[in-house]
Amino acid sequence: KKQIITIALCIPMWMQAQNIDHVLQSIEQNNKELQSAMQLTKAQKMENRTANNLSDPTVSYSSFYKNGAGPGHGTEFVASQGFDFPTQYITRNRQADLANEALDKQQQAVRRDILLKAKILCLDLILLNQEKALMNIRKQNADELEALYGKRLEAGDANILEVNKIKMERMNVQTEVAQNHASHRNALQSLLAMNGNLPLEFAETNYPQVKEIMDFNTMRDEVIASDLDLQALSFTTKAAEKQVSVNKQDWLPKLQAGFRRNTDSEMSMNGFVVGGSIPLFSNRKKVQIAKAQALSAQLMQDDARLQVENNLMALFNEMQQLKEAMNAYDMPLLYKSLDLLKQALKEG
């Protein structure tokens, strides 16, 4: 399916596809699912940045008294700020950039899927519009034949079985017309729902012209290079590999610096607070976890690429078979045969 998506959206379209372009532009602006995905991506990207925030500053105040007789009262005020080793912020920032690139590609893939669904509905409507035109011709022929054989029956040139056969054909055509109308209405309603239930019209009867795909290798290279899912997995893999570096640097000490003021009944003193913590326990096995996750991401990327290539081969073969089947149809001959059949029935 994802390969069909890529092919369908990358195929160039000429003037008769302008109506489809207009529909897709409108849906891109008004589709609620797409708007929701954009906001979710925005939130996730900001969340990725929060991992690189400074920790909250700490403030403490102490008051203590001297035991025994005589005055004695002292206070202590400490304000400090903890921070990581400076290189950790640089590494985490690069990891967040890669993770956000993956999110952008995922959001673009959601957009692609939504627009493909809308494009398929447009193509369905084109088919239904073509069927409607053909059924109108069939209905007109059936009406004329029913009137003609009604007169022949009155003149004695036809029997009741022939007239009933014409009437049955006319009823069958009316049933197909009703089914076509229902299918058209359902497809158009689905298109309107994707457009946020805003008004939308689509009366196109011609399919967009497409560039014929002759060489599988060329198609494969183009699709793989532009496949958004593969691009997202590529950035996810790079982000996972960068996370290994982040976790390795988590072994660096956490630093702390601040201001300290002590006072008592006789004097006051100001000074600085400098300290740190060594992550002997909090970072255990995090590097191994990150390496396993990076390997998993790489394997997922390799598997996805293989799936893309296999699906492309199957789709290419199916496309070739459909092309041969379409070439077997002579549409002008079919319409000519319909006219000849109508003329033959009129002449008896």
Residues of each region from the PLM?
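Bacterial Sec-pathway N-terminal export signals of envelope proteins
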Residues: 15-58, 63, 83, 91, ...
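Solvent-exposed loop/turn segments connecting transmembrane beta-strands
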Residues: 40, 64-73, 236, 260-271
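Amphipathic alpha-helical coiled-coil segments
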Residues: 36-48, 110, 114-137, 144, ...
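Periplasmic alpha-helical coiled-coil/stalk elements that build and connect Gram-negative outer-membrane
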Residues: 113-226, 315-322
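A glycine-/polar-enriched beta->alpha junction
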Residues: 29-35, 45-56, 77-95, 105-112, ...
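Sec-dependent signal peptide recognition
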Residues: 1-7
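Transmembrane beta-strand segments that form the barrel wall of outer-membrane beta-barrel proteins
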Residues: 57-67, 89-91, 252-263
